[in-house]
C-alpha cells in the first residue's frame, strides 16, 4: 500500500508532532536518522529531517531544509557510490549503499544509506524516504579485519614458502592417507623417494608392495595403530622399481573422526643407516685392535721381566719396546689401519739407528702391503734385532752391515714370500743360551700370523734369518698376481 505523506510535506521539523497518526509520530521521533525529499521540486530537495538525523550530522533544521543531500558528500566520497545513488533515483528504485558522508564539523563517517521511492495510490512518484546509520566503527573494524586477514594471508604464504624450502632442503616428503580407503596424496619429494611418477595415483598398497618382506608386517601394524590418534615413527626398507634397497623413516599421526586422515612425512635415511653400520663396525674394530694391542703390551712386559733381572734395565727395555710399538701404531694410523708396506715398516722401526748407522743398514724389495698385526710384529722384531746388532752383532764394530731383503718366489709350484735379515762383517757370533725378544717375536708372532717357516743361523759371518711364508689375502691384503718373482741371492 502506498503511503500518503502529503499532509506533512509542507511542514518542517516538528510538523509531525502535531499529527495524531502514530506512523507520522514514529517517523519524527525514531532514533533512526531519516530524511524525506521531494523529486517534484528543483534538485530534489530535503523537505523533512527528523531530530535523529540532525543529531547525527550536527546541522540545524534550517541548514538542511531545501538542500539536496549531496552537501553531505566530500573529498573522501567515492564517485562510484554517488553515481549508483543517482542511477537509483533516476530509475525510481530503492538502493542500499555504504557511502562516506561528512558531518557539519567536517568529521567523516560511513553512512549506511537506504533510499526508497514513495508512490501514491495511482503509482505516481511522490517522495523519496531515506534512512541513515553511522556504521563507521563497524566498517573500520571490518577494514582492520581485512588488513589483518591480508597480513595473515601474507604471513601464511611466507610460512608456507619457508616450510616448502625447509622440506626441500631437508629432502623430506609429506603425504596424507585416507585411513579406510587407503588413498594417498604425495608431495613431489615423497614421490621421488618412493620412485613414483608425478601423475601416478598412489595407494597405501602401492607403497606396501615396495616394502621388503621382513619389514612389511611392522609397517602394516604401525599403519593400523594410527587410528588411535597417537603419533608413530618407523624405519623400514623398500626395494625401488630400479632394484635399489633404501632405508626410509616415516613419522605420522592421524586426525581422528568419522573418516580419519593420516598425515605423515617420509625421509630417505639410507646414508644415515650406512653411517650407523660403519660406526658399529669401527667400534668393533677398535675394540678388536685395543684387545690386540693390550695383548702385545702384556707379551712385551712378560718377555722383558722374565729375562731381565735388573729393575732399571727392565724399565729401560720396556720403555724402548713400548716406544717401538707406539711408532708402529702411528704408522698404522697414517694408513687408516690398513697395514703398511715392508719398506715403511723397515724405515720406521730402524729410524732411531739410521742417524748413526745410515750407510750400514740396507733394505730392498718389491712394494708389498702386509696386515696391521704383521706390521706391529715386524716393527718390534726389526727394532729388537737392530738393538741386538748394536750390542753384539754387525753394528757393534765399525765395518759391519745389515741387509734386509724380501721378494716373491716360487716354491714347489706355489708363490711364497721370502724375507731375509743378514748381518755381515761384524764380530763372530755364537748362538746364545736363550733366544732374545726379537727372535721370539719372529718365531711366535710371525710364524703364527704368516704361517711362516723361520730359520735362524748364527753363522761365522753374522746372524742370518730367513722367513718363508705362503701368500694369503689375510696377511697380504690387496696382493696382486702381477708382482714379479724375485729370488733373494
Swiss-Prot record:
EC number: 2.7.13.3
HWE histidine kinase domain: annotated span: 285-367
Enzyme class (EC, first level): transferase
Keywords in alphabetical order: ATP-binding, Chromophore, Flavoprotein, FMN, Kinase, Nucleotide-binding, Phosphoprotein, Photoreceptor protein, Receptor, Repeat, Sensory transduction, Transferase, Virulence
Domain PAS: 19-93
Disulfide bond positions: none
UniProt-listed InterPro entries: PAC, PAS, PAS-assoc_C, PAS-like_dom_sf, PAS_fold_3, Sig_transdc_His_kinase_HWE
SMART domains: HWE_HK (SM00911), PAC (SM00086), PAS (SM00091)
PAC domain residues: 93-147, 232-281
Modified residues (Phosphohistidine): 288
Reactions listed under catalytic activity: ATP + protein L-histidine = ADP + protein N-phospho-L-histidine
Keyword Protein transport: no
Listed GO MF terms: ATP binding; photoreceptor activity; protein histidine kinase activity
Up-regulation conditions: Induced after invasion of host macrophages.
Modified residues (S-4a-FMN cysteine): 69
Alphabetical list of NCBIfam families matching this protein: sensory_box
Function in brief: Photosensitive kinase that is involved in increased bacterial virulence upon exposure to light. Once ejected from an infected animal host, sunlight acts as an environmental signal that increases the virulence of the bacterium, preparing it for infection of the next host. This photoreceptor protein is directly related to the bacterium's survival and replication within host macrophages.
Protein name as annotated: Blue-light-activated histidine kinase
Lineage: Bacteria, Pseudomonadati, Pseudomonadota, Alphaproteobacteria, Hyphomicrobiales
Amino acid at each position: 500500500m502506498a503511503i500518503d505523506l502529503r499532509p506533512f510535506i509542507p511542514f518542517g521539523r516538528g510538523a509531525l508532532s502535531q499529527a495524531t497518526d502514530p506512523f507520522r509520530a514514529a517517523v519524527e521521533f525514531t532514533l533512526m536518522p531519516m530524511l524525506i525529499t521531494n523529486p517534484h521540486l528543483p534538485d530534489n530537495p530535503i523537505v523533512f529531517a527528523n531530530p535523529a538525523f540532525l543529531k547525527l550530522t550536527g546541522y540545524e533544521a534550517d541548514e538542511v531544509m531545501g538542500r539536496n543531500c549531496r552537501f553531505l558528500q566530500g573529498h573522501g566520497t567515492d564517485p562510484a557510490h554517488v553515481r549508483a545513488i543517482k542511477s537509483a533515483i533516476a530509475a525510481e528504485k530503492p538502493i542500499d549503499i555504504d557511502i562516506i558522508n561528512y558531518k557539519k564539523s567536517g568529521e567523516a563517517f560511513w553512512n549506511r544509506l537506504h533510499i526508497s521511492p514513495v508512490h501514491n495510490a495511482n503509482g505516481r512518484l511522490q517522495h523519496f524516504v531515506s534512512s541513515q546509520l553511522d556504521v563507521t566503527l563497524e566498517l573500520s573494524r571490518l577494514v582492520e579485519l581485512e588488513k589483518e586477514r591480508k597480513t595473515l594471508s601474507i604471513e601464511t604464504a611466507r610460512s608456507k614458502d619457508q616450510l616448502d624450502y625447509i622440506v626441500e632442503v631437508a629432502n623430506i616428503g609429506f603425504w596424507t592417507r585416507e585411513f579406510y580407503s587407503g588413498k594417498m596424496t604425495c608431495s613431489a619429494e615423497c614421490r621421488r623417494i618412493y620412485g613414483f611418477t608425478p601423475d601416478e595415483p598412489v595407494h597405501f598398497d602401492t607403497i606396501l608392495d615396495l616394502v621388503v618382506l621382513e619389514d612389511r608386517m611392522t609397517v602394516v601394524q604401525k599403519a593400523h595403530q594410527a587410528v588411535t590418534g597417537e603419533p608413530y615413527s618407523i624405519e623400514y626398507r623398500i626395494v625401488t622399481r630400479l632394484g635399489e634397497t633404501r632405508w626410509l623413516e616415516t613419522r605420522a599421526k592421524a586426525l581422528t573422526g568419522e573418516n580419519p586422515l593420516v598425515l605423515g612425512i617420509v625421509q630417505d635415511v639410507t646414508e644415515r643407516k650406512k653411517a650407523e653400520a660403519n660406526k658399529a663396525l669401527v667400534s668393533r674394530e677398535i675394540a678388536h685392535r685395543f684387545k690386540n694391542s693390550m695383548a702385545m703390551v702384556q707379551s712385551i712386559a712378560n718377555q722383558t721381566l722374565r729375562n731381565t733381572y735388573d729393575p732399571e734395565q727392565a724399565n729401560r727395555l720396556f720403555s724402548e719396546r713400548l716406544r717401538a710399538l707406539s711408532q708402529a701404531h702411528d704408522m698404522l694410523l697414517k694408513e687408516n689401519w690398513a697395514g703398511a708396506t715392508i719398506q715403511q715398516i723397515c724405515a720406521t722401526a730402524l729410524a732411531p739407528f739410521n742417524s748413526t748407522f745410515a750407510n750400514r743398514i740396507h733394505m730392498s724389495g718389491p712394494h708389498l702391503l702386509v696386515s696391521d698385526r704383521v706390521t706391529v710384529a715386524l716393527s718390534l722384531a726389526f727394532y729388537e734385532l737392530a738393538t741386538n746388532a748394536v750390542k753384539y752383532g754387525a753394528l757393534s764394530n765399525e765395518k759391519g752391515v745389515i741387509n734386509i731383503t724380501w721378494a716373491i718366489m716360487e716354491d714347489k709350484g706355489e708363490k711364497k714370500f721370502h724375507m731375509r735379515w743378514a748381518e755381515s762383517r761384524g764380530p763372530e757370533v755364537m748362538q746364545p743360551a736363550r733366544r732374545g725378544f726379537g727372535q721370539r717375536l719372529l718365531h711366535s708372532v710371525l710364524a703364527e700370523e704368516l704361517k711362516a717357516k723361520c730359520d735362524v743361523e748364527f753363522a761365522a759371518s753374522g746372524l742370518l734369518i730367513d722367513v718363508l711364508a705362503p701368500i694369503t689375502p689375510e696377511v697380504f691384503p690387496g696382493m696382486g698376481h702381477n708382482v714379479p718373482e724375485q729370488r733373494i741371492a
